[in-house]
Amino acid sequence: PFRVRGSLSSRSGLTFRVREFNNALFKLSYELSNLIVQDINYISSRTGLDEWFDYDSWAAFKQPFSEKGLVALSQSLASVMASTIGKTKKIIISDLDDTIWSGIVGDDGIDGILIGPNTPKGELFYIIQKYLLFIIKSGVIFSIASKNDNQVVSDVFKKRKGDMPINLELSSSSKINWTEKSKNIKEILLELNLLSDSAIFIDDSELECLEVETNTNGCIAISYKKSPIELIKKIDSMGFFEITSISSSDKSRTQYYKDNKEREKLIEKSDSYAKFLESLEMKTNVQWKLDKHIDRASQLTKKTNQFNLTQVSIEKEDVKSYQANNNKWIVIADLVDKIGNNGIVTVAFGLCKDKKLIIENWTMSCRVFNRGLDFALLYEILAFAKSKGLQEIHSSINKIQKNKFTHNLHELLGFKLTGKSDNKYNYV
């Protein structure tokens, strides 16, 4: 940690060599998809070098980090590991007053709230909004839950548009009323087909955060005591939105949910759900060659919870293996309709063995539930099995609380139960 040569160490000494070595590792990680480099330099900088090392511990038992450093390191490592298995958070839900702007709009008025770089306090909240925008662009869903007047809030975003990076269009679901925030959050998650343990809620009030955590199952609520920047520090240190890669689907996620709002309007106008589906004019493109979508295929097996039959996930290198092996298979599909393109939303993979096609796992994004894509993909799998001379299709499901949505899937698709053990049900 010491720069024996002072600033010269950054150009030619140990500091320089360590930095060059780390840069080489980062470059290598772009070539090797399974190599993930943990940014220790950032973690140590955030902690502070003077508080990062513990020389007494090093001298005693060769453990170089301080207690504070160990906590920061372990939190970061846990976040990276969680990201590799798709266990990062999916949605951030935000309050408004004293959370993304300074002041209470109902009391201070639209022109009275502070937001933007023109005032010190306003700039702090501007930084909050910029941070939220970066999170949204990385594929995290953004929503609003605020005790406020809906029309007043709408006017704020219109009249103060030039001062704010965030706008209402970025919110996939907004609940702006005087109802308990936990109830609004539950409605948001239900509307977006998300589980409560995939959500983070931010609010200036510790009391509101307590109410949310008490009445929702798994939603983490974060507040601040002195400065709103504490919100960023807490989210950053806990690594709730750690990612190891960004797919095209991640970048378009906000648009996907915006399109779903238009589909909901169509449902209200339709005489029946069947008529609604017909009006969508849906098309799917089933792909057995995944060269451009390897990242997305792997991601779907990790991040999907509600339509995830066996919880078996695969890495990017595994996807390539399934494509290259004649005794294995993998398939993906997108879903396009007159409203928009949902992107790649489902993946299934498995084995061909003893005249049988075995489905090892099948996952589907919650964005396209109840659209008939499960029937369409199974039809393609049946055609594939027939072309290979396979006589049976075998599948199974591990019934857990998170995939309750699919507990009756096999029966709906025409499979017959052949046996069960504990929570595992086998079908043919």
Regions found by a protein language model. Give the residues of each.
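Conserved Lys-Pro-Asp/Glu-containing loop-to-beta segment of HAD-superfamily phosphomonoesterases
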Residues: I185-E206, V212
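Acyl-donor binding region in acyl/amide transferases
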Residues: D337-K338, G343-N423
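Substrate-recognition element of Asp-dependent hydrolases with the DxDx(T/V) motif
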Residues: I127-K158, S174-N177, R296, L309-I314, ...
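Basic, amphipathic juxtamembrane/active-site segments
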Residues: V105-L132, G218-Y224
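A conserved beta-strand-loop-helix scaffold within acyl/acetyltransferase catalytic domains
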Residues: N285-R367
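Extracellular glycan-modifying ectodomains
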Residues: P1-I93, I100-W101, G106-G112, L207, ...
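Acidic carboxylate-rich catalytic motifs and surrounding loops in phosphoryl-/glycosyl-chemistry enzymes
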Residues: S33-L49, S146-D149, E180, S396-I397, ...
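Terminal substrate-recognition subdomain of acyl/acetyltransferases
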Residues: E213, N217-L280, A383-V428
